[in-house]
Swiss-Prot record:
The gene is secA. It comes from Thermosipho melanesiensis (strain DSM 12029 / CIP 104789 / BI429). This is Protein translocase subunit SecA. Keywords: ATP-binding, Cell inner membrane, Cell membrane, Cytoplasm, Membrane, Nucleotide-binding, Protein transport, Translocase, Translocation, Transport. Monomer and homodimer. Part of the essential Sec protein translocation apparatus which comprises SecA, SecYEG and auxiliary proteins SecDF. Other proteins may also be involved. It is found in: Cell inner membrane; Cytoplasm. It holds the Pfam family SecA_SW. It comes from the Bacteria. PANTHER family: CHLOROPLAST PROTEIN-TRANSPORTING ATPASE, SECA INNER MEMBRANE COMPONENT OF SEC PROTEIN SECRETION SYSTEM. Part of the Sec protein translocase complex. Interacts with the SecYEG preprotein conducting channel. Has a central role in coupling the hydrolysis of ATP to the transfer of proteins into and across the cell membrane, serving as an ATP-driven molecular motor driving the stepwise translocation of polypeptide chains across the membrane. GO terms for cellular component: cell envelope Sec protein transport complex; cytosol; plasma membrane. It catalyses: ATP + H2O + cellular proteinSide 1 = ADP + phosphate + cellular proteinSide 2. GO terms for molecular function: ATP binding; protein-exporting ATPase activity.
Amino acid sequence: MKLFDKNERVLKRYWKRVKKINEINLSNVPFSELILNMEKIKNNITGENIDDYLVDVFAIVREIAKRTIGLRPFDVQLIGGMVLHEGKVAEMKTGEGKTLVATMPIVLNALLKKGVHLVTVNDYLAKRDAMWMGPIYLALGLRVAVINTQNKSYEVVWKNKELFEKAIRENLSVWPEGFAEEFLPDDKKVNTDCFDVELKEITRKEAYECDITYGTNTEFGFDYLRDNLVINLDSRVQRGHFFAIVDEVDSILIDEARTPLVISGPSKTKASDYRRFNQVAKRLKKDVHFTVDEKKKTVVLTDEGIEYVEKLLNIENLYDPEHVNKMYFLLNALKAHHLFKKDVDYIVNNGEVIIVDEFTGRLLPGRRYSGGLHQAIEAKEGVPIKEESLTYATITYQNYFRMYKKLAGMTGTAKTEEEEFKQIYGMEVVVIPTHKPMIRKDRDDLIYRTEEEKFQAVVSEIKKRHEKGQPVLVGTTSIEKSERLSQMLKKENIPHNVLNAKYHEKEAEIVARAGQRGAVTIATNMAGRGTDIKLGPGVKELGGLLIIGTERHESRRIDNQLRGRAGRQGDPGESIFFLSLEDDIIRIFGGEKLEKIMNLVKIEKGEPIYHPMLTKLIERVQKKVESINFAIRKNLLQMDTVLDAQRKAIYSYREYLLSGNLDEHFYDAMEDFIERILEEFCEKEVCDTQKINESLKILNIDEKLPDTREETKKYLKDIILKRYNKKKEELGEDFSKIGKYIALRVLDENWRQYLEEVEHVKEAVSLRAYGQKDPIIEFKKETFRMFDEMMARIYEQSIVYTLNIRKITDEAEKESKKELEKLYVQHDEFSLVNRKERRTAEKKGKKRLKVKR
């Protein structure tokens, strides 16, 4: 009860502002005057006084929306807009008009000319929403663009600018005069041709220079990573991270938080290794040679398994450093066979393994699991094995979105994850009231003994409802289960649509028809998110849309999303979940308790058991799973936060190099290089000149050195600087271009290798938890040491390569750009490979982190 009291208190403050907005009547103000008023605000608004203009801007946007697209934001939508402007999460039920809500805070913040990003879950929604809301922005003199995953970018422009200018002169509107209802149907709109828009292709950089940019979460993240791989500052596309509104915020910031964005390129591992270890994995017996933990998604070899593998491979010690790769191949092969299922985690299509997004059920073509896992699955399925990828750049969504100065989000379901939004992103959740009361009926769960009994009951329920014409939407958790149910419905001659990853091109169209009389739709997870299901004629009288869930998800939130497809905007609706003791979440986390209850009440075959207590028990199981997943995400974030500080240091150093500070970079490198040599080979003031000379062989320096530390330091500086200046003179104007190119290659290659090593460390430190060591502290210690060593290598190699450079042709630079184009984006599962920990001897001398900021 307290939770909602708090929400009510928060809403009171917003209602006061709504009252002020409603006091401003702009319906008789000429179009040209509205635009002029916004222009005046644009000239006076600043980051400090932005809140003072909220009431006026929201009132103008409301009126412009009514005139250009025929939608007038309701009072509750104004509240949603205020919540977003304040950098919070607005929980708004399905059908409450989140797309329109976003326009008000977008316009208000876009007036600051720093760029506002609207983040959606797919290209279709980004394009649809930018074009749908585009007339509002264009009428107010703002530029709006769309970026998509095909690396195409578009600006939304007037189809006929003269017609729009005529609309301003003659005060035309799509809203007919005298129309008094609050919602304007499409067939009643007038003058629509004055406000038609189209897309004009532009560059990615131009898209980010627009006031408002719509796009997917993956593209915004990948553009940031790509910007930090360029070899010229002009090639960067983004201009900063000021304000982002994330649509379906729970899906992007929570469900996908365990999925780092990765830019990678090809490796040199042999396909034959994967095939060989695929055969070895087939010979190992589960629970004899290895154990599988489905909760943690890990595979661990038993002692018996280790001995058996050593015998099979004819080696003495599987954990010997020279055999570490064999362990890596083997564990990946075992995971491919026992943790990744065909038609659930991936599908095989035209000889290719394509990942299925576990949250949306969509296919992710072009995305690959990293660390050799994808190749292991290809070996298992007997399809051609593609080369393994090397990581060039990576970031988690958590750390990408935390870069924004202000971050807001909207979704139909967020309150259950409020703690995570607050802890990780500093965002409060505000539940926005619905415009009309919600009258959907949510029934208690029906629980069956077996999955077969459950599906028979689902088919029987669909048949009963279909006969009376009531539309039914069935949610499943995998493609496999969608198709199983589809086959059962075919046998009963029930016409239906299947909506899953295999058919997502038709997604929006199928979802939009799901509320028509007699429609039966099977959908994987939340396929079709963002598309409203409107009820057809006569459907309200039949009870509205029936939602059937065929399994509980790991998160209550995803169940609520499925339920939320019915009962939009005060429509009637109903939801029921059909479950069985064989469902994954019940089997893994709570099956024994439920089975005891089933046995106690002696349920007959095919009969369900339903009781509010059982629904609560399942909810407790979900809360348990949610807390496990939250802990995993938090753990990942803690590790990535360590990496994030290092990433920012490297990227800031990269920018420093791109800006052409070559001399300073060389002096930094030289200072570090000399200091490390002296630390290692000098005791107080006396130095071991023989060992120093050996270290200097990489620079082709073989001189008689002074005995004291200070003199040696000065002497080395003089020699190195003399050679540096000679090289500058030798290459003339080309030196700066060549030197920058070399410095960037050295930095990028070392950072790439470092990212690969960090993945191994993540795996190794997770094993140390068994030895009562805190994995996060271990990870920090290990990566700090590794980062320090990497910086030493960067400095050393920078000196060596700079002093030995020769002229490079323009071809070399073109070749480098081609290499960058070969890099591809990748879907990276949370690290699962279990590796033998490899210890590295600590280097002598104190630790220093020397990075130019």
